[in-house]
Amino acid sequence: MLRIIFLGTGGSLPTRNRNPSAVIVNLKGELLLFDCGEGTQQQMMRAKTGMMSLSSIFVSHFHADHFLGIPGLIQTMSFLGRKEPLTIYGPEGTKEFTEVFKVLGYCNLKYEVRGVELSPGDIVEGKNYVVRALKTEHSTPSLGYSLIENPRPGRFNREKAVELGVLPGPLFAKLQKGNPVEVNGKLVKPEEVVGAPRPGRTVVYSGDTRPCEAVLEASRDADVLIHDGSFADEMAGWAEESMHSTAGEVASLAKEAGVRQLVLTHISSRYTDDVGPILNDSRKVFENVIVAEDLMELEVPYRPD
C-alpha cells in the first residue's frame, strides 16, 4: 500500500478550508510526513492516520507555515507514551530548530527527537524505500524530496517452475525470495523462473519553489508529483517575485517529465472560493492534474507489468 493523505493544502495564510502545508505518506504501514504546518496533528486525527507509526518528518524549509505544527505533534506523542525515536530531516538550520522544538512549553520528551540537516543529493534509506533530497528555488534554504520505493521482485513463472520439476509449496517460496532449490539432484536457479525486478513507485514533493531543474529531473516518469501550485497564470509576475509557481508552469514541467499524476498544493488564499483558474490553467497543458484539498487521499497503484 502507498497512500498519500493531504493534511494541509493552503498557502502562506490558512483559510477556513485549507490548513498550512502537510502531506503524509503511508507506505506499507510506515508514516512519513512532509512538512508539518500549524494544526497538523488535528488533521491527522481527522484523517485517522494515527501518529505513533510516524518515523520521519521531512521539512522543505523553515517558513512558519511549514513547521509550526511540529512542537505540538512531538509533545502529543510523548504524552501518549511514544518510545521510538523520531528524526526530523530538513535543510540548513534543521538541527537548531529541532533543539528549540524539544524545549518549547517546558515539555520533557520521553523519546529521542533528532534533527538531521540534508544537502541536495543526500539519501535517507528506509526499510523498503529511499528519500532523496532535491535542490529547490525558494527565498530561504529549501529542499524538495523524492520518495523512491525499492524495486519489487520479478513475476514468478509458475508454469516454468513446474516444468522444471518444482512442486508448489515451500520450494516456490524459496525461489521467489531469490534462493536456488534442488530438485531430483538438479539445481533450479531463481533467474530461471523469476522475471526481472519491477520498479517501485516514485512520489516527488517539491515544497515551495519555482519550477526548477532538480525537480524536473527527479520527476521523470514519476507516479505522482506534488508541487507548489500557488497561483493561476495571471499571477506569474508575483509568483516569480515570491519564489512560488503558477499552475501552467508546473503543468509544463509535469508534461516534460512524463509524470503520471500531478497534484497541485500550497494554494493561495486568493482562491478560497474558486480554484477554477488554477485547474483550468494547468489542464490547458497537462490533463492528469488534481488541485489538492485538505483530507484528500490518493492511492498510488503499481504500474501494470
UniProtKB/Swiss-Prot annotation:
Belongs to the RNase Z family. This is Ribonuclease Z. Signal peptide: none annotated. It comes from the Archaea. InterPro entries: Metallo-B-lactamas, RibonucZ/Hydroxyglut_hydro, RNase_Z/BN. Coiled coil: none annotated. It is an enzyme of class 3 (hydrolase). It catalyses: Endonucleolytic cleavage of RNA, removing extra 3' nucleotides from tRNA precursor, generating 3' termini of tRNAs. A 3'-hydroxy group is left at the tRNA terminus and a 5'-phosphoryl group is left at the trailer molecule. Zinc phosphodiesterase, which displays some tRNA 3'-processing endonuclease activity. Probably involved in tRNA maturation, by removing a 3'-trailer from precursor tRNA. Zn(2+) 2 binds at residues 65-66, 208, 266. The active site is at residue 65. The keyword Metal-binding applies. Binds 2 Zn(2+) ions. Zn(2+) 1 binds at residues 61, 63, 138, 208. Disulfide bonds: none annotated. The lineage of its organism: Archaea, Methanobacteriati, Methanobacteriota, Stenosarchaea group, Methanomicrobia. Keywords: Endonuclease, Hydrolase, Metal-binding, Nuclease, tRNA processing, Zinc.
